[in-house]
Amino acid sequence: MDILFLFLMVIGFMLIGVPIAVSLGLSSILFLLMHSDASLASVAQTLFNAFAGHYTLLAIPFFILASSFMSTGGVAKRIIRFAIAIVGWFRGGLAMASVLACMMFAALSGSSPATVVAIGSIVIAGMIKNGYSKEFAAGVICNAGTLGILIPPSIVMVVYAAATDVSVGRMFLGGVIPGLLAGVMLMIAIYIAARIKNLPKQPFVGWKETFDAAKDASWGLLLVVIILGGIYGGIFTPTEAAAVAAVYSFFIANFVYQDMGPFADKQNTKPVLVKIFQTFVHKDTKHTLYEAGKLTIMLLFIIANALILKHVLTEERIPQMITESMLSAGLGPITFLIVVNVLLLIGGQFMEPSGLLIIVAPLVFPIAIALGIDPIHLGIMMVVNMEIGMITPPVGLNLFVTAGVAKMSMMNVVKAALPWVAVMFLFLIIVTYVPWVSTWLPTTLMGPEIITK
């Protein structure tokens, strides 16, 4: 009954307009003061232990910084050019190229909103110019942008790994096949819609342009090889990989592509050595660091408040109570996965993915292990639910970002995204009930997961 009061407080604060992160933290602290035997000092200890014990959380600010440099530079334009060269000659090819570009940029950014902004700000106008409706273009980008948290490296996967103590490397591998499958399913749906609506196709650009576009985009796409190759080659940990990614992104944006900083200013005639030193204090670098810092603080503030709620639930033994009640009720794996999907789909409509995972993952993880469900399978399924949550109202983040990029009303974006959400629901069913889609690659390359807790 006390826990019901806690969740009513959280919902009540949200309804009166209190930010979600503050609602989680404030409700938890008030609950501790009024209903729990635990002290507030234990909250501070829990937060310290959570961040000190989860070294992988340090990857989040570095991945955000890498994403910021990649978004600020002209990487997105080069990726879009390459994607159009590959699939643009199909009917509906420009929309399919948008999905492919989102898939490639997702592998660089690890963030859905960043993917929508970087790709959508360029291709939506191009699609409209080539005979696509604004609604069609916005709906495609809104959904394809969600691949930013499914295709590795992914910030949300790092959060899940930290919340459940599973391997970040396994989670990244687990997202490869589902990410490719989701992108292919969206492109097939676009092709079918294009045939029905007789949408335009681009002429084949030729092999020379294809190779030139690939060469131009290769410096940016090499980041994926560095991150994943470095992790699975044993060169560095996921956290170190994130730091390397940030440094590499800074180097590529400033010195190779020269899309920002003093090298982008053609009127700057100072010696090269002077320009190199100017790069580190240039206004573009400062602005990128500032924006990445703002996003990092916002995300970690949400995670910190979610950790307080997680602490309260743990103190009240809620995970153990839920596990015991579900197992004693004879709940099987199929029914359990349905319950988790429904819970996450509802929660994803109101909460940011990282905060929701911090709360829900520790609750359902022990039950999943007891039922013999692979932790990587569970993690990828939860990430897919977060994808759908980002494109469903009332607070789906991708909906707001797409509305801003496409200059459309929120309701029009919701209507535009709805047909493609059906594709994502079909994809969720596949990921939920065909576990090898997410477990085959990590098991093949790294062996079976060993649970130690």
Model-assigned labels for residue ranges:
Residues 1-453:
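Alpha-helical transmembrane segments of multi-pass membrane transport proteins
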